[in-house]
UniProtKB/Swiss-Prot annotation:
Gene transcribed to yield this protein: KDSA2
Its biological purpose: Catalyzes the stereospecific condensation of D-arabinose 5-phosphate and phosphoenolpyruvate to form 3-deoxy-D-manno-octulosonate 8-phosphate (KDO-8-phosphate) and inorganic phosphate. Involved in the biosynthesis of 3-deoxy-D-manno-octulosonate (KDO) which is an indispensable component of rhamnogalacturonan II (RG-II), a structurally complex pectic polysaccharide of the primary cell wall. RG-II is essential for the cell wall integrity of rapidly growing tissues and pollen tube growth and elongation.
One Gene Ontology term of the molecular function aspect: 3-deoxy-8-phosphooctulonate synthase activity
Organism: Arabidopsis thaliana (Mouse-ear cress)
Protein name as catalogued: 2-dehydro-3-deoxyphosphooctonate aldolase 2
GO biological process assignments: monosaccharide biosynthetic process; pollen tube development; pollen tube growth; rhamnogalacturonan II biosynthetic process
Length: 291
């Protein structure tokens, strides 16, 4: 199990031009997830991009207690296992409690640590002990240096297979911005750097609802902008949530990318990545210039 994780990790580290973590935000039904997995795999295979399929079994930090959360861990893992077998795809999904890591590690190839929990040592250690690849999302409240420490917690628990993910920084109330400097600085964690190009455009609890209450909004129209920036900088991986009907998605509809435009966007990103030197350190010569 640990060997298969290391093999996948080694493949993702050298993926060119980048690897892709993609899928619908949450498991809505078995039929929907299987259909989405097939569609996304068909596109990624056509474009030659290594794909890890993503979907969550439980959205534990919804804005409202009345919001849809997903099928739960037991049922959700059964569905993700079917995706894995049916389409020969590695799986990434998130955990929220240390007690979930063992069961999730039996299905997922990558265990994702949510941004709000990126400093939780017990959770990081429990996830690391699964032997699977660990993808740590940078908290919206954190500087880039926190990711170096979080990655080190995973390594000290005996697991060298770790990645860090930029997903935006709080900018006042109910808004996030993406600081592209973090995509460079997070390399100090000495591991692959992933850019979450969808959640990073979320507007947390920024949408007022008719009849009172709030929900999270988002700036879907800026997803291409953030994606172009990320691949130009030279990230190792792109994380994005994709939906075939985003206006009716039960979770994070405003920041899910339409499936019908996925191939078009990825083609553009591949073209940008093919000409950038972002993965190479720019060597600056500060000696006095002479003609």
């Amino acid at each position: 199990m640990a060997n298969s994780a290391s093999l996948l990790y080694d493949q993702l580290k050298v993926a060119e031009p980048f690897f892709l973590l993609a899928g619908p935000n949450v498991i809505e039904s078995e039929e929907h997830v299987l259909r989405m997995a097939k569609s996304i795999k068909d596109i990624s295979t056509k474009l030659g991009l290594p794909l890890v399929f993503k979907s969550s079994f439980d959205k534990a930090n919804r804005t409202s207690s009345k919001s849809f959360r997903g099928p739960g861990m037991a049922e959700g893992l059964k569905i993700l296992e079917k995706v894995k077998v049916a389409f020969d795809l590695p799986i990434v999904t998130d955990v929220h409690e240390s007690s979930q890591c063992e069961a999730v590690g039996k299905v997922a190839d990558i265990i994702q640590i949510p941004a709000f929990l990126c400093r939780q040592t017990d959770l990081l250690v429990a996830a690391a002990q699964s032997g699977k690849i660990i993808n740590i999302k940078k908290g919206q409240f954190c500087g880039h240096s926190v990711m170096r420490n979080s990655a080190e917690k995973v390594r000290l628990a005996g697991n060298p297979n770790v990645m860090v993910c930029e997903r935006g920084t709080m900018f006042g109330y109910n808004d996030l911005i993406v600081d592209p400097r973090n995509l460079e600085w997070m390399r100090e964690a000495d591991c692959p750097v992933v850019a979450d190009i969808t959640h990073s455009l979320q507007q947390p609890a920024g949408k007022k609802l008719d009849g009172g209450g709030v929900a999270s909004g988002g700036l879907r129209e800026l997803i291409p902008c953030i994606a172009r920036t990320a691949v130009a900088v030279g990230v190792d991986g792109i994380f994005m949530e994709v939906h075939d009907d985003p206006l009716n998605a039960p979770v994070d509809g405003p920041t899910q990318w339409p499936l019908r435009h996925l191939e078009e966007l990825l083609e553009e990103l591949i073209a940008i990545a093919s000409v950038t030197k972002g993965k190479q350190q720019f060597q600056i010569d500060l000696t006095p210039y002479r003609d």
